[in-house]
Amino acid sequence: MTYVQVENIDKWYESGDTREHAVDDLSFSVKEGDIFTILGPSGCGKTTTLRSIAGLETINSGRIRINDEVVSDPSRLISLSPDKREIGLMYQSYALWPHMTVKKNITYALDGRDYAGDNDERVVEVLELVGLPEIGDRYPNELSGGQQQRVAFARALSYEPDVLLMDEPLSNLDLKQRRQMRTKLLDILDDVKMTTIYVTHDQEEAFEISDEILVMNNGKKAQQGPPEELYQNPTSSFVADFIGEANTFDATMANGTAERCLLRGASEPLELSTNWTEGNAISEPVVTIRSEDISLFDGPNDDRDGVENVITGTVAQKRFRGDATLYLIDVNGVEFKVQTDDPHYRPGQQVTMEVPSKSVAVVQR
């Protein structure tokens, strides 16, 4: 069942005689109980989109529905205030009142929403839910960053909203804390079964927590789908490059078909067999290859049976990444990124790359 529906929304700001679009004709839907992530670089419009759903921004056109109720529609002069939208909000800054105890921070939110149950009992419930049952009498400055984050989460859940909106909630934590809190958040959201819209610029975070991801760029939808689909089948060079470690090359079609492509910029012809099948015409083809889909072997070897794309190159750089090593391989002036768990290759060494054609995608620039 669709629980949140965003239909062709626009949000712009006047700048002299021009309009600067923060969100441009954006549409998507969120299923009930899903964790739906809006992913994109800084300035792409993801936070403005979240604030528009929350009622903190007034859209210029389009329509937003929550649980089949229209909450924003400028054409009908509908714009419900945030407290009328049955949403929970969690910000990048935890926005805890410093002069209030943890308990009072949560009861303040309950009072503001006219919570029908017993406030004291609800505070106990949500603090137990986030694993902090003993801190109700402490003040925010007596808590670690991770604890403050969990208190903010408890507060957002306290009045049992229909939809939870989370704007970069883990960005103020260090890497270890972020990974720990992702696990905790997933456990809690699995318990409460709450429809969640989550904003982040962190691809790893988005892939780990999401049922569905919307990638945004320049205020527009770039692509939407399950994490695996976005990773394996990007529809544009932007999505391929933004998600994961991808090689992206401008190309031309060989023999008029994208089944084989010539990479531009190489000093000698460099042609690859691709996974292209008949589909929409591509006017500006870009070849994309995931760095982990390329295999490396010692020395030049152009005669490897059963592999369509066998390429000889030279290791230009080596970058250690803990559980993997990233190599930059120069092939006639074109640079390939190859990620592998084999650390023995050295800069200056000649190597052979095997690139399965099923891993060579062709997308529109």
Residue ranges and their predicted role:
Residues A246, G256-R365:
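Non-catalytic connector elements of ABC transporters
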Residues E86-Q92, L96-D241:
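ABC ATPase nucleotide-binding domains
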Residues L39-P41:
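The feature captures the beta-strand-to-loop junction immediately N-terminal to the Walker
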